[in-house]
A protein has these predicted regions:
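Proteins synthesized as precursors that undergo proteolytic processing into mature forms
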Residues: 1-115
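In a subset of proteins, long, contiguous C-terminal domains/tails are tracked
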Residues: 99-152
């Protein structure tokens, strides 16, 4: 049967990735992403944008993204599971990712697929623990919105 079937000997794979980041034991960042198999990858994309590249939520969720799609599609209704696999080594990138970067990825052996629309649908909320400032953002291209209310 299908890998996500609930039956003896299988380990269903789900894509839910609610993410809460703590700083000194207190919540400072929350991420939610809708998008099936792309959820984990998009969560990592925007978390790295925040942690490594210092982007605030509005920039982190709207920056160009990428996703590997060389695995079996969990949501493919095709009963022939062999046809549910995307081409090995394929990489989907946002159309806004620079041509030079796309060419470099292709040179490294990736089959680059350019997507005009969004890759998954992220929202992010950040609390600056020093100032108390709240930042909330959703990717408008994905029609996502985020809001926060400071009750202090």
């Amino acid at each position: 049967g299908h890998p996500n079937c609930i039956q003896p000997g299988t380990r269903p794979r789900i894509t839910l990735t609610p993410t809460l980041v703590l700083k000194e034991g207190k919540p400072c960042l929350a991420i939610s992403v809708a998008g099936g198999d792309l959820q984990d990858q998009t969560t990592l994309n925007i978390l790295l944008n925040f942690v490594e590249f210092g982007m605030l939520p509005a920039d982190a969720v709207t920056a160009q993204r990428f996703a590997t799609e060389h695995h079996q599609d969990s949501f493919d209704p095709n009963p022939n599971r062999e046809e549910a696999f995307i081409e090995p080594g394929s990489l989907t990138v946002n159309a806004g990712l620079g041509q030079e970067t796309q060419a470099d990825l292709a040179k490294r052996g990736h089959t680059v697929r350019v997507k005009d629309g969004t890759i998954a649908n992220p929202v992010m909320l950040y609390v600056d623990q020093e100032s108390g400032q709240l930042y909330a953002a959703g990717d408008p291209a994905a029609r996502r919105h985020a809001a926060a209310l400071n009750t202090k």
